[in-house]
Amino acid sequence: MDVEAIGRVVEQANDAGTELIRFLYVDHGGVVRGKATSRSTLERRMASGIGLTVAMQAMNMLDELQPVDGMGPVGEVRIVPDPDSYVNLPFSPGAAAMMSDLIDLDGQPWAACPRSFLRSAMAEAARDGLVLQAAYEPEFLLARRETGPDGDRLVPVDESLCFSTTGFALAHDFAIDFVRAIAAQGMAVELYHPELGHGQQEMSIRHGPALAAADRQVWYRETARGVAWRHGLWASLAPKPLPDQAGNGAHCHFSAWTATSDSDPGGRGDPPRPETHNAFYDAGDRYGLSPLAYHFIGGVL
């Protein structure tokens, strides 16, 4: 890893008085996992990564190890952080985090690393002169967790109607803290409204290159839960947390843009400059779609 990048992260951690820095990754079940290093060992751990048993990528969402060849309790990879993804966590004072790649002991991206797979897909698109843009449209339930004779249950913070001002008012304190926490991590909430389900929230983050968009979705999920807990609440992004209410969507919007010399196929910059071209658009087509767009849709289907 670049020595200058490591030094920049160490300086950020020192300036913020950060005590623990989380090296995070996402497993095949969508669970955000990781390990943390202290500030005193941050420089060394960034260079070496942190060891992780290969079995973790065979765990299901209940931490039950599944029988997958090559993913047993013997063998490890390294959790290697991306220094460009460093953020201080406003909902966990004294902590910071970085998104990480899973690297094998030969220093190569591990085949079972989702983030490395996305990097590879973006590089393949870049070879065809394309930059992939993406954004998520996540929804989540904001609720109180109550314990009763039949076990824990989630009770929504409101029973308001979709888009109603009552919903805005009842979730106001949480919403403001969420927006500020997102901004503190270098992102911005573009739209917000109470959704169809009781207690259901929708806050949308601006699109960006695919890798950045995926990382932002992780920060979004972590922030929703972290801010909720500090309010004594529970934020659930599960597809159907309440059987009698609308489920939570997590729509992923994506498009392809022609790359220019100052585009950012590496994945961490702003959206394409105005002079780049939306490769999915064709003004002469009945539906405004280019041949590439039709082929892309066909590939997805």
Name each region found by the language model:
Residues M1-L191, L233:
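ATP/Mg2+-dependent ligation/transfer catalytic cores
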Residues V26, P138-A143, E195-Q200, K240-G249:
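A glycine-rich phosphate-binding loop feature that marks nucleotide/adenosyl-phosphate handling sites
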Residues A212-L301:
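Glycine-rich anion/phosphate-binding loop at the beta-strand->alpha-helix junction
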Residues V3, E190-G197, A210-A213:
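Metal-centered catalytic cores of metalloenzymes
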Residues F23-V26, A143, Y192, R206, ...:
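Generic beta-strand/beta-sheet core signal
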Residues D150, V189-S204:
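A short mid-domain helix/strand-loop element embedded in enzyme catalytic domains
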Residues V155-T166, H198-A213, L242-G247, N278:
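Active-site-proximal beta-alpha loop/turn segments in soluble metabolic enzymes
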Residues M98-D104, Q201-H207, F254:
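Short, hydrophobic beta-strand segments
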